[in-house]
Amino acid sequence: MTELIKLSAAALAAKLASGEVTSVQVTQAYLDRIALVDGELNAFLHLNAEEALRVAAEVDADRAAGKELHELAGVPIAIKDLIVTKGQPTTAGSKILEGWISPYDATVIEKIRAAKMPILGKTNLDEFAMGSSTEHSAFGPTRNPWDLTRIPGGSGGGSAAAVAAFEAPLALGTDTGGSIRQPGAVTGTVGVKPTYGGVSRYGAIAMASSLDQIGPVSRTVLDAALLQEVIGGHDPKDSTSLVDPINGQTGCTGLADAARLGANGDLTGVRIGVVKELGGEGYQEGVEVRFRESLELLRGAGAEIVEVSCPSFGYALGAYYLIMPSEASSNLAKFDGVRFGLRKLPEDGPMTIERVMSATRAAGFGNEVKRRIILGAYALSAGYYDAYYGSAQKFRTLIQRDFEAAFAQADVLISPTAPTTAFKFGEKMADPLAMYLNDVATIPANLAGVPGMSLPNGLADEDGLPSGIQLLAPAREDALMYRVGAALEALHEAQWGGPILDRAPELGAASNATAVEGTK
C-alpha cells in the first residue's frame, strides 16, 4: 500500500470509482502510515480511526449497491484542530480547550460528511492559530517531513506536514494571514486561501473574523480545487458568506474544470503581474532564484509577465498586527473559565468571576496568545482606537485599492510565498518581529479578501528545502487562479520529472532518530 498513499486525491478517487481499490483499504493505508511516522512528526492531535473506517465501509457498500456518490467519496481527509467536529475533541492547540468535545459540526464538516469523506483525525496548530511555525502549540511542535529539526510553517503546520508526509491525501486548514499558504511553501504542498466568504467560517474557532478563511491543503492543484468545491458555497449561518444575487455564485464553482484546463500548460494571453514590493531585501537568494526561473517558465508558456507596484503593501504587516490582535482579543474573551473549557480557581482570596477568569486565562493561554490579546486590547482602548485600530483600517483600504489597480494591469499576481525556506526550531522564538515577517507576502490577500494559492516552487540551492510560489487573483476569480496554478504545476513537473514531494526523505527510518531527539 506504500504507492497507494502517494497517489493524488483525484487518482485515488478514480481507483475507487473503478473498483480497483476499496475505501477501507485506502483509509487503513493512511492510518498505518500515521502509526508509522507520526511519532516523529506530531502532525495529529487526535485520531478518528474507528469512525473513518466505518464511513469508508459505508462508501464501499454504497458503491457496490450502485448508488451515486460524490467524486471524493471514500477519499480520507485530515482536519485542522481549529474546526469543530461533533463528538470529537477540538482544542485549537490550547490547554484552555483540552478535553472539550464539540456538540456540533462546522459547516465545512457537514459538507465533508455529506460527501462521505472519512475523517482521519485532527491536526496540530499554533495555539488559536497564532503563529508561523506550529511551535506555539500547547501539545508540542509539529516537525517538517523534509528535515525534522525544522518547522513546518504555521499556524497550520500539522495539516501541511500530514499531507507532505503522506499521512493524508487532503486536509483542511484556516488562513488568517498565511496559515495555509506559508506551511504549504515550506513543506512542498499546495495551500489555498479562497476568496473571503467563499467558504463558510461557521464552526471555525475565530481568531480575526474579518481575516479568517477555511481552505484546502493538498499535494496537487486539482486536488485542492476538488476539495474547495466540496466545502465552498453560501451558508446562511455565516453572516460574511458570499452569494451573488444574480447567479448565486461564490467563486467556488468550476474550479476543477479550470485546473484541468490549466494542466495543458498553455497560458497564452494571460497577464501575470510580478509585485515589486514582494521580493528583494529579506528574501533568501535561493527562493528568489527559483522564483525567477518560474517566471521564465510562465513566459515560455505564453504568459505576459508585467511588473506591478503596490506601495501600500509595505504597510500591510503593521496594519495586520493591529487589526488581527484587536479582533482576537475580542473573540477570545469567551474563554473565561465559566462557560466551557478549562476552569482554574484562584488559590486564595475571594471566589469572584473576575478572579476565576484571571486564573483560568493565565493557566490556559500560552505566551503568544497572551501577547496578542494584550496588544489588541491596547489598540482598542479608549484614546488609542483611532490612532491604532482606526489607522490600520485606513491602510487596509489603501491595500484594497492597490490590488484593484494591479488587477487592472494583470489578470493574476505572483510572488514568492515566504521569504525563506523552513527555519530551525527555536531560531525565531525569541524575536516575535522576525517570526511575523514570515507572513509579509501572504498578509495582503487577507486584508483585501482576495484568493491566494501557494504551490511548490522547487528546492532552494542553499539548503535543498522546498520554496513556494504564490498566485493571487481578484475576488471571486478563484477559477482563474486554479487555471494558472495548474499550468505552472504542469510546467514544474515536466522540468522536475514528477512532483517535488517525490524528492522528500523517507520517514519511519531509524536514521531519523537523532534529528527527532534534537527537537525535543
UniProtKB/Swiss-Prot annotation:
Could you state one GO cellular component term attached to this entry? glutamyl-tRNA(Gln) amidotransferase complex
The UniProt keywords, alphabetically, are: ATP-binding, Ligase, Nucleotide-binding, Protein biosynthesis
Subunit composition and interactions = Heterotrimer of A, B and C subunits.
List the Gene Ontology MF annotations in alphabetical order. Answer: ATP binding; glutaminyl-tRNA synthase (glutamine-hydrolyzing) activity
Spell out the catalytic residues.
K80 (charge relay system), S155 (charge relay system), S179 (acyl-ester intermediate)
The major lineage groups are:
Bacteria, Bacillati, Actinomycetota, Actinomycetes, Micrococcales
Instruction: Tell me what gene encodes this.
Output: gatA
Transmembrane ranges? Answer: none
The identity of this protein, by name, is Glutamyl-tRNA(Gln) amidotransferase subunit A
